[in-house]
């Protein structure tokens, strides 16, 4: 007789913990394998975040039965999900939870476990707009089919048998990804293999299928060659947010996002009123168009994935003070900013730019910042997780976001010692530190440290983000982490000291243009103008002409750059 009659609450928790621990230990391996649908090197991190959200939620909850535990874990996965792979995994766990609602209170027996695995496979397909073979989806389907075959053929199927064959099914799918077109090993398929072997090890720890799977992944990756992107239209930006909506609205949004981008995932669970919290993810060239047309989104984070075209982007108003060129200085460097595959955490300093101006999303992201639109503390914490760097500058845009940034910093610090897990099977301590997950051989490594800059308005935030982006680009390979951090701290300070911010309101466009021109000084090198949504369209050309003439009169026109942006924000609010 099997030692386990049910996959109960304890086993569910152990599964999530073991899977999370495996991904923490070998997330970098998954990251280096990540090329589909875009080489943003984050599958390992995204899956780890999602598993951490599920395990943390279950650890902290007081559940009454298995169905309740599965619901809590899946909800935590949705909130913790990052990226396309995290979204797919969260949708799988939601499907697992929905299947578990009809199970006995003690947990899943073999027949219910197979049904749950099959539901997860369907959930993986449902999570994406354009399912692709040889990826996350294939591995989950193969695992579910192997479990179902065991249920059909074994005279007395046990949980040990079903979980072991499901793990072997996932392993077979990983091997079959070789040569499909996106590299010898797909990172998403590899992640599912680790998750399924972790489940098998819960019921048979001596088997150590996870260790075998890790060795197999390592061996297969040794001959890893340059991957070919399967989809030819992966967007320049990744957009993620949480959104309260009905199932019908979510489906409409999914279809709309499919028209403007790919890697679309809209996942969530609805209640009896057909309302739910959905996690939205898309890769697109038009991040503003990816925002929902109705309802309120929160935790809106946007980051740049790659350059979609070699030529630099143009000024939103089509000019600068020099007349002949449409290119603004920041775009000259940001358009040449290389896509960074397999980014090393220790060599990067993250920048989180807070804004309430949708028109600034693209230039900020192209400067290398993770952009948080309509910031609050939860959104900033999420952005810190997306950065995956031990240090990050937060650039607030107003007094409210300054408070939110400090609250986020306190939140990350307080989470550092909340939940340390001893995974005896893997032999090391694992820490889930808020949304930045790290490990070290001797215990715990530092979580993301947030440094809040003194930027109290949109212009100060924007100019500082430009300066930090340029400093990071010019010194990306010459300095170690400590030196780079010191450089960027000084850059932010010098920028703040040398910056003069003017705010204008009213209907007299000529008066505003002259006021901007009269603010020029002998040492002025850059003028950045943010034009609000309610400002007349003739203000921008008037400012250009007035500043250009004044600069010429002062003899500084050859060294002066004027950048004018339509912020699409009511700056009077």
Task: Label every model-predicted segment.
Residues 1-573:
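N-terminal loops that bind phosphate or other acidic moieties
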């Amino acid at each position: 007789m099997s030692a386990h009659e049910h996959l109960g609450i304890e086993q569910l928790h152990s599964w999530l913990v073991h899977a999370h621990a495996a991904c923490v230990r070998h997330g970098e391996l998954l990251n280096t394998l990540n090329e589909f649908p875009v080489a943003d090197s984050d599958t390992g991190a995204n899956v780890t975040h999602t598993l951490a959200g599920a395990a943390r939620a279950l650890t902290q909850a007081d559940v009454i039965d298995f169905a309740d535990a599965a619901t809590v874990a899946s909800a935590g996965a949705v909130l913790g999900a990052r990226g396309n792979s995290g979204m797919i995994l969260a949708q799988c766990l939601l499907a697992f939870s929905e299947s578990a609602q009809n199970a006995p209170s003690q947990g899943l027996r073999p027949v219910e476990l197979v049904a749950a695995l099959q539901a997860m496979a369907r959930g993986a397909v449902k999570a994406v707009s354009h399912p692709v073979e040889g990826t996350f989806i294939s591995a989950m389907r193969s695992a579910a089919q192997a479990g179902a075959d065991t249920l059909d053929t074994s005279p007395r199927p046990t949980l040990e048998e079903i979980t072991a064959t499901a793990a072997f099914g996932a392993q077979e799918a990983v091997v079959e990804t070789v040569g499909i077109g996106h590299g010898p090993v797909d990172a998403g398929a590899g992640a599912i293999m680790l998750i399924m072997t972790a489940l098998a090890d819960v019921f048979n720890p001596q088997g150590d299928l996870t260790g075998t799977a890790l060795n197999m992944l390592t061996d297969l990756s040794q001959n890893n060659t340059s991957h070919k992107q399967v989809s030819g239209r992966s967007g320049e930006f990744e957009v993620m947010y949480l959104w309260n909506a009905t199932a019908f609205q979510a489906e409409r949004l999914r279809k709309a996002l499919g028209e403007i981008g790919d890697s679309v995932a809209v996942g969530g669970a609805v209640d009896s009123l057909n309302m739910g919290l959905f996690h939205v993810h898309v890769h697109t060239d038009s991040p503003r168009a990816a925002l929902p047309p109705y309802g309120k989104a929160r935790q809106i984070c946007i980051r740049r994935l790659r350059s979609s075209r070699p030529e630099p982007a143009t000024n939103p108003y089509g000019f600068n003070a020099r007349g002949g060129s449409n290119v603004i200085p920041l775009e000259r460097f940001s358009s040449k900013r290389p896509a960074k595959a397999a980014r090393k955490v220790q060599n990067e300093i993250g920048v989180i730019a807070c804004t309430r101006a949708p028109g600034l999303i693209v230039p900020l992201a192209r400067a290398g910042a993770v952009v948080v639109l309509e910031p609050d503390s939860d959104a900033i914490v999420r952005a810190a997780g997306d950065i995956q760097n031990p240090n990050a500058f937060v650039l607030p845009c107003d007094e409210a976001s300054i408070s939110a940034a400090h609250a986020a910093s306190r939140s990350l610090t307080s989470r550092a010692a909340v939940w340390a897990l001893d995974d005896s099977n893997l032999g090391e301590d694992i820490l889930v530190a808020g949304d930045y997950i790290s490990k070290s051989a001797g215990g715990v490594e530092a979580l993301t440290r947030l440094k809040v800059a003194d930027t109290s308005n949109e212009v100060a935030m924007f100019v500082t983000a430009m300066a930090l982006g340029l400093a990071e680009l010019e010194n990306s390979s010459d300095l170690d982490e400590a030196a780079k951090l010191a450089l960027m701290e000084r850059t932010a300070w010098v920028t703040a000291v040398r910056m003069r911010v003017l705010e204008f309101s009213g209907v007299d466009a000529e008066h505003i243009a002259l006021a901007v021109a009269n603010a020029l000084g002998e040492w002025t090198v850059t003028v950045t103008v943010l034009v609000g949504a309610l400002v007349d369209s003739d203000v921008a050309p008037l400012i250009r002409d007035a500043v250009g003439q004044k600069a010429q009169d002062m003899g500084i026109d050859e060294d002066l750059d004027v950048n004018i942006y339509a912020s699409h924000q009511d700056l009077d609010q």
